[in-house]
């Protein structure tokens, strides 16, 4: 009679121990479920942050490309305007040179028909000839200078067009690189998601809690090691590559203009205004001063 009672007491004790063990396991499972939910929430938050960063990066790249296109168009328009101004100035100089030659011929004919003393006439003709030669040399130098400036401006416009073409090519390369970076990030996330498959083999109940905690800790450690530094370095590398590819066309667009400004500062603006009408009229007045003296002496008609 005592042996069945002892067995009953033992069974009741085992039942109480089983219930306590069951309660402990249920609490452990609830804790693991809460931790899993928090990890899932963090993962969703990180994915949302990554999507927002990708949207901001795409918006910034579009804005930078638009500004670069507008700046290139403005530089091309300025170069065309300078070329047109140089061409117009050259035509004005040629027309003024023709007028001076006509005046010289008219004055020569007047001196020939309205003679005076032979010596004074020869001296006046010699002075006028020397001044005309000097003026023609000056005009030739001015024409050569303006032709060189026009050639420099044409070369600058050509460099600008070449830089714009290279910028368009690099924009295509940039888009391809962005697609490859997104594909690599998706592949990395897929490999991380499928790298640890569930093990279908049964495990003892005593080792379940320890193995689950070890797996969660190992996953968190791997995520901190690879997900923090690897993804960050990949994003930093992609951003540096984007900045480099966007700044290269800007460098190609600015270098020709800097070269023209530093190497030949008189090729823009002041070079076009250095030969003004005042200097030309002063030289013309100096050239015609002997004729005015002849007119004052009464050797030329009024």
Curated annotation (Swiss-Prot):
Keywords: Coiled coil, Membrane, Transmembrane, Transmembrane helix
Bias type Basic and acidic residues, positions: 42-53
UniProt topology in membrane: Single-pass membrane protein
Sequence segments annotated as region (Disordered): 39-66
Subcellular location: Membrane
Ranges in coiled-coil conformation: 5-147
Keyword presence, Coiled coil: yes
GO cellular component terms attached to this protein's record: membrane
Transmembrane parts of this sequence: 242-262
Chief site of localization: membrane
Annotated family: Belongs to the TMEM191 family.
PANTHER family with a match to the protein in the record: TRANSMEMBRANE PROTEIN 191B-RELATED
Annotated protein name in UniProt: Transmembrane protein 191
Taxonomic lineage from the root: Eukaryota, Metazoa, Chordata, Craniata, Vertebrata
Gene that this sequence comes from: Tmem191
